[in-house]
């Protein structure tokens, strides 16, 4: 499937036709959620952030807005929306949630649920200086091109773990973020 000119309607119809299969087991992991913000344009974009270099975990890494589910959150979707508002000032009311991808286990012990949402193209992003050093948009068609991601096998504590690596402009996209983007591509039927 060729994605040089992926429209939002193409993306939505593929996503809705191929509903993700969710595994409800939490395996006693702490819960977290990220928002996968798809920017509503004729050629949609994928909104990403670069985390502040001053953070204790994942400093300087490219990421989706998101974080741990807290006691005030009614669901993982609510957590993703809250975190997106805190990190880049996306109002929850501006997000049209279209679904979730299967949860991903992080190396830090969280089970992270990716929440897919459509956002308007004219939102004035405002990065939280404590958490985010940059906000940028990548064309969705480029992000979903599986050939841009390269595998790296890491051995940690006796286990093999595959991570994916890619560049977009000056941004190094890798790890969980690259893995989630690849999962989104596979979910809508992109062939490896």
UniProtKB/Swiss-Prot annotation:
CDD domains: NUDIX_CoAse_Nudt7. The keyword Repeat does not apply. InterPro entries: CoAse (IPR045121), NUDIX_hydrolase-like_dom_sf (IPR015797), NUDIX_hydrolase_dom (IPR000086), NUDIX_hydrolase_NudL_CS (IPR000059), Nudix_NudL (IPR023735). Mg(2+) binds at residues 83, 87. PANTHER family: MITOCHONDRIAL COENZYME A DIPHOSPHATASE NUDT8, NUDIX HYDROLASE. This is Uncharacterized Nudix hydrolase NudL. PROSITE patterns: NUDIX, NUDIX_COA. A motif (Nudix box) lies at residues 67-89. GO terms for biological process: nucleoside diphosphate metabolic process. Probably mediates the hydrolysis of some nucleoside diphosphate derivatives. Belongs to the Nudix hydrolase family. PCD1 subfamily. It comes from the Bacteria. Residues 29-160 form the Nudix hydrolase domain. Keywords: Hydrolase, Magnesium, Manganese, Metal-binding. It is an enzyme of class 3 (hydrolase). Its cofactor is Mn(2+); Mg(2+). Its EC number is 3.6.1.-. It comes from Escherichia coli O7:K1 (strain IAI39 / ExPEC). GO terms for molecular function: coenzyme A diphosphatase activity; magnesium ion binding; manganese ion binding. The lineage of its organism: Bacteria, Pseudomonadati, Pseudomonadota, Gammaproteobacteria, Enterobacterales.
